[in-house]
Amino acid sequence: GDSWIGPVYHGILSTPFVDVPTGTLYTVTMGRKDKESNLSVHALDIYTGKPKYNSPQLLSFPFAGAETLTNVKGALQRVGLLMRNDVLYIAFGNIVPDPKDQHWSQEGFVQSFNARDLSQRLAVFQSTPTGRKGGIWQAGRGIASDRDGNIYIATAGGRYDGVTNFGSSVLKFAPSSLKLIDWFTPHNHEFLFLQNID
């Protein structure tokens, strides 16, 4: 079975982000209801615990086969959250059956949201649309940014072709839009991936 990835049915797996000026804590939770496992993003008042900014919002994951899933038992959100210039960034790794053909699909996602209205998802980036690994785990470390607001993440071992698949790479994105603007991939990425020593 797939018990090695869990079982993870509920809780918070990543480091939340606290926006001190607005007194807001942003976090992602995994919940289980009616045999479905769902991830949700929350904005909470740090003084009262009450929801803010149209939260919680159910997270969804678009696949290359044009279907979108919200029941994602194998999706894990381990990477620390980041908020920059009123945009919230969340990264994921998943091991989920692709709805197109039910093969076990493994890839990473980065999603950006309007931090003042979590019902507004701004962009989604999928690291390996072919489902050939490349999840975003980062050993729980957070998403990084530079002084210009560009966003940086590292993908795990996976397929790389420099076109649509970006496993085993460090990726640089434009703010908000998640447009991929640069990346680094080691020359021996295939060896590192196949030997699981990335």
Q: What name fits each language-model region?
A:
Residues 1-198:
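Mobile, glycine-rich extracellular loop/lid and propeptide segments
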